[in-house]
Amino acid sequence: MEGVTGVTWTDDVVPGTEQWQRFRRLFTGEVNACVEGLFTAGATGVLVNEAHSSQRNLLLEDLDERAVLLTGRHKPLSMMQGIESDVDGVVFLGYHARAGEEGVLSHTYLENSITGVWLDGRPAGEGGLNAALADEHGVPVLLVTGDDRACAEAADYAPSAHTVVVKECVSRYAAICRPPARTAADIRSAAAESLRLAGRTAGDVRPHRIEVEFDAAHLAAAAAVIPTVEQVDVRRVGFDAPDMTEAMKAFKIVTTIAARAVQGIYG
């Protein structure tokens, strides 16, 4: 949701605020533009997996009736739930840049506590992690939308994917935003064009290592209590997994434990 046009501030994406109510509509509008483009190009079905915060932000009553919505929390594969089913491509809509980089509301999973994530030694954000999981299932990333920094980041993990820049980052809390009518038109067009990339292939199943760096030492210590997770530095933990699916399950546990260990204003 942080990568939707107009979104620049915490209240824009925090459930329950007045601004969040406004941006739920804009978020749903961008999703509908994508859905329309995919069906126009010949898609036979679209599953929308809602994955921001409570994962209950999109307005089902306003969703394109040809799509179906996966909403709610505690999904085994989180943002990528559904990848294990018969899908031929994925779209990352409303994405943001990774933690530690410039970008509107940039972060990786936790808003502030994580300062960096590395997948097999390379920096990775939510897009990079999710793309690796898609690759394990042989599913290509068709389209990425968000600010200019998120789209530039996509070139590293999904070089063949189409991108739509809906706003240009000025700072973590400011952006030059394009009106929804214009971004919707571009998303619709790019989604239609991107469908030519669709097609499931043999998956790349192999072991992976993830390392996570936090902004405070006690968060790393808390995460290191998890079996198989080791504390490799004062603020960093790492773990190995036999495949990306298991790696993401372990990553989810690490972030959950770390989030619980955050203590008030001191973090």
Regions found by a protein language model. Give the residues of each.
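Short glycine-enriched loops at secondary-structure junctions
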Residues: M1-E2, A51-H52, L93-A99, D148-A150
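Glycine-rich nucleotide/cofactor/substrate-binding loop typically near the N-terminus or early
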Residues: W9, G29-S85
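Short catalytic helix/loop segments, enriched in acidic residues and glycine
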Residues: D11-C34
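C-terminal accessory domains and tails appended to enzymatic cores
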Residues: V46, T183, R188-G267
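Short beta-strand segments
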Residues: N49-E50, V90-G94, V144-T145, E213
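Acidic, His- and aromatic-enriched active-site or binding-groove loops in soluble protein domains
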Residues: E65-M80, G116, A161-E168, R172
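Active-site glycine-rich loop that binds ribose-phosphate moieties when present
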Residues: K75, E111-H137, L143-R149
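Active-site rim beta-loop-alpha module in soluble metabolic enzymes
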Residues: E136-V141, T145-E193
